[in-house]
């Protein structure tokens, strides 16, 4: 810091101070502060002395305590400011912010000049401030004063001695001259700008500034809200630095703009929106006549058995089914269950359209099938023309594909109901196509996990005729036929049908609810499986619920030639397939390796009178049913695979067929031996000699005839 400058002569200092006081007295109308004479002879304090020494001197004189401020530095420049600038020991440099300059301290003699005699300092300052504020200066002051910023209610400190905000300026004492110019911005604003500019300077080793680092650190603390941020401040600091110097590496897939969770939440918002413009009466009618099932009640009963989905998901499924009913002309709707997948799962809804609503869609499907048949016949004609051009025709194989089994009509058999699926509540519902017998037969021979995407091809052997949507529909038909059960007596056959059986031999295919059903006690439902029946038709090995003769000819097939008729007659007749009729008790189901196909239990064995009867399928794991009183329901939550006591063995490929039929034309003969060749040659010579002799004899006979 160096040695302090030599103290000026006390007499000169006293004369300069008296001259400045006389000049100020002529310009200001405010009374001057009297200076005690005993304070004039005090030597000035050395530079760098603590403020506590000055306070002790003031306490010794009995005067009021002066605030511990850094210095008395003027704020204005002009004629009066020249006197202050000449006193350079104060450490104030013109044109430079006061906060960044070295501030000096007034000596004791100068400080004692500011004290009044016989009057309290605070009272004198208050009267001086009120007088100056009422003048023109109060109108020209565009910036708030320090005493206005820091009110008496605000708690200050502790502050450092050299804090620029604590400097006692002459303006606070009422010595500010009246000037017409707009004052400069306060030093505090300049200090803030300079400090921020300093913090924004980037580091020498990276492009990161201290300001950005502190902002990120505070943002992270405010977002995470740790319990003790001070204890983990050091670790957070290291983590933030590591994140800056170790950016995220590039990935093969771009990060999604919106997380799947938020995207799903946005889609599910539409489920909670009520339709506007409807009265209370209309809403009541919709509640009573709506085909939407009571999913929450079903979930409550299955929850007692430890089965089902969460209450939140069940409610969202309820809203999704309500949305489906509003979009489609549905007469009956039911939540079938949930089939799990590797990537996404399927929520399945079993519905039945109102009469006449499905005819248009069936006609479109038939038109597409007819167009495909036309293309196939056109291709066959082109193939026949090519065969005529080729000289060596390729022999046709003797194998013939099995006859195509027609699928069952809508509202009957395996296609009695329609099924809609979606991956999550809020996503659009997709209608599954009708199932064909070939798809059901092939689905029994393969076992594939679902991926969650309906257009995924099913790669298997034997080849599955369709994609994942068709495979899903086939599995739904198989599970429904085997696991949909109800208490005995809940359904009954209609009186109009009678006891006549159809041609297929499957018996009755429809039933109705029994209005006189009063329910079966829970203990009886658990004790005997004869109190439960199947209310879904059994699927025959053919892939249909009603048997169809594949050899039965249609009108087009009767026009074929006699060759095809002979080939058909050579084939053996197919035996008719017969399955169990509707409403067959579960006690007649076949066992699985000496294992019962069903398991029954109570939801709570401690209170049987309030329990629910639960039935679980051992053949299709994930299929459950409950019954209590007049209520029952079925649900399936699983992977869509049938239980097999042994490991799954895929079907082996068929035997390789012969490319050409064996015959003498293509049979290779063995080479003859030498003896055989000689014998053959001798035989040929004898045959030639005999032929020549015969010719000669014939010629002689002809000559004789001519002579005669």
Curated annotation (Swiss-Prot):
Residues 47-56, 680-690 have a biased composition (Low complexity). GO terms for cellular component: axoneme; radial spoke; radial spoke head; sperm flagellum. Transmembrane segments: none annotated. Disruption phenotype: Male mutant mice are infertile. Mutant spermatozoa exhibit shorter tails, misshapen heads and immotility. Manchette removal is impaired. InterPro entries: Radial_spoke (IPR006802). Residues 1-94, 376-407, 495-514, 663-708 are annotated as: Disordered. The keyword Cytoplasm applies. GO terms for biological process: flagellated sperm motility; manchette disassembly; mating; sperm flagellum assembly. Functions as part of radial spoke complexes in the axoneme of sperm flagella that play an important part in motility. The triple radial spokes (RS1, RS2 and RS3) are required to modulate beating of the sperm flagellum. Component of the axonemal radial spoke 1 (RS1) and 2 (RS2) complexes, at least composed of spoke head proteins RSPH1, RSPH3, RSPH9 and the cilia-specific component RSPH4A or sperm-specific component RSPH6A, spoke stalk proteins RSPH14, DNAJB13, DYDC1, ROPN1L and NME5, and the RS1 complex-specific anchor protein IQUB. Interacts with RSPH1. Interacts with RSPH3B. Interacts with RSPH4A. Interacts with RSPH9. Interacts with RSPH10B. PANTHER family: RADIAL SPOKE HEAD PROTEIN 6 HOMOLOG A (PTHR13159:SF1), RADIAL SPOKEHEAD-RELATED (PTHR13159). This is Radial spoke head protein 6 homolog A. It comes from Mus musculus (Mouse).
């Amino acid at each position: 810091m160096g040695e302090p400058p030599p103290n000026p002569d006390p007499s000169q200092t006293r004369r300069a101070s008296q001259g400045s006081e006389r000049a100020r007295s002529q310009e200001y109308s405010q009374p001057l502060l009297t200076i005690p004479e005993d304070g004039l002879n005090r030597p000035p304090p050395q530079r760098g002395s603590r403020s506590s020494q000055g306070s002790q001197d003031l306490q010794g004189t009995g005067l009021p305590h002066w605030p511990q401020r850094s210095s008395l530095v003027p704020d204005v420049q002009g004629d009066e400011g020249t006197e202050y600038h000449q006193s350079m020991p104060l450490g104030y440099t013109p044109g430079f912010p006061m906060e960044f300059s070295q501030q000096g301290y007034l000596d004791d003699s100068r400080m004692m000049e500011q004290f009044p005699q016989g009057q309290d300092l605070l009272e004198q300052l208050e009267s001086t401030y009120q007088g100056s504020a009422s003048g023109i200066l109060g109108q020209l002051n565009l910036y708030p004063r320090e005493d206005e910023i820091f009110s008496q209610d605000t708690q200050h400190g502790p502050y450092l001695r050299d804090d620029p905000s604590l400097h006692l300026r002459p303006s606070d004492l009422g010595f500010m001259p009246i000037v017409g110019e707009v004052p400069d911005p306060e030093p505090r604003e300049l200090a803030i700008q300079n400090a921020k500019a300093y913090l924004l300077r980037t580091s020498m080793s990276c492009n990161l500034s201290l300001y950005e680092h502190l902002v990120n650190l505070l943002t992270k603390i405010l977002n995470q809200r740790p319990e003790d941020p001070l204890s983990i401040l050091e670790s957070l600091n290291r983590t933030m630095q590591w994140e800056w110097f170790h950016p995220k590496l590039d990935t093969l897939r771009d990060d999604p703009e919106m997380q799947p969770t938020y995207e799903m939440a946005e889609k599910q918002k539409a489920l909670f929106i009520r339709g506007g413009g409807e009265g209370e009466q209309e809403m009541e009618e919709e509640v009573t006549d709506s085909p939407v099932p009571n999913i929450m009640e079903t979930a409550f009963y299955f929850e007692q058995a430890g089965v089902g989905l969460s209450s939140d998901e069940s409610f969202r499924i309820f809203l999704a089914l309500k949305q489906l009913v509003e979009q489609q002309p549905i007469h009956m709707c039911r939540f079938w269950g949930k089939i799990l997948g590797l990537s996404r799962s399927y929520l399945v809804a079993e519905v039945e359209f109102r009469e006449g609503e499905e005819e248009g869609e069936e006609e479109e499907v038939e038109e597409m099938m007819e167009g495909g048949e036309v293309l196939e016949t056109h291709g066959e004609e082109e193939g026949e023309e090519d065969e005529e051009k080729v000289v060596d025709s390729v022999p046709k194989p003797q194998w013939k594909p099995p006859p195509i089994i027609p699928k069952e009509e809508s509202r009957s058999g395996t296609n009695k109901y329609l099924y809609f699926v979606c991956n999550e509540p809020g996503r659009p519902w997709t209608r599954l196509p009708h199932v064909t017998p070939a798809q059901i037969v092939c689905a029994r021979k393969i076992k594939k996990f679902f991926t969650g995407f309906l257009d995924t091809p099913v790669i298997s052997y034997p080849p599955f005729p369709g994609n994942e949507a068709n495979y899903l529909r086939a599995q739904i038909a198989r599970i429904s036929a085997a696991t949909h059960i109800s208490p005995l007596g809940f359904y009954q056959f209609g009186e109009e049908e009678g006891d006549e059986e159809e041609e297929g031999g499957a018996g009755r295919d429809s039933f109705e609810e029994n209005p006189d059903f009063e329910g079966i006690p829970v203990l009886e439902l658990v004790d005997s499986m004869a109190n439960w029946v199947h209310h879904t038709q059994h699927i025959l090995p053919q892939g249909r619920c009603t048997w169809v003769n594949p050899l039965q000819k249609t009108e087009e097939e009767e026009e074929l030639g006699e060759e095809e008729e002979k080939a058909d007659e050579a084939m053996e007749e197919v035996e008719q397939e017969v399955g169990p009729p509707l409403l067959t008790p579960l006690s007649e189901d076949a066992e699985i390796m000496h294992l019962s196909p069903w398991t029954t239990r109570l939801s709570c064995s401690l209170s049987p009178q309030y329990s629910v009867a639960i039935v679980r399928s051992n053949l299709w794991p994930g299929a459950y049913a409950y019954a209590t009183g007049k209520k029952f329901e079925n649900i399936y939550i699983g992977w869509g695979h049938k239980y097999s006591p042994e490991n799954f063995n895929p079907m082996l490929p068929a035997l390789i067929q012969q490319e050409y039929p064996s015959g003498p034309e293509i049979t290779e003969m063995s080479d003859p031996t030498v003896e055989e060749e000689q014998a053959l040659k001798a035989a040929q010579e004898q045959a030639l000699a005999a032929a020549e002799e015969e010719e000669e004899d014939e010629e002689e006979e002809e000559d004789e005839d001519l002579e005669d």
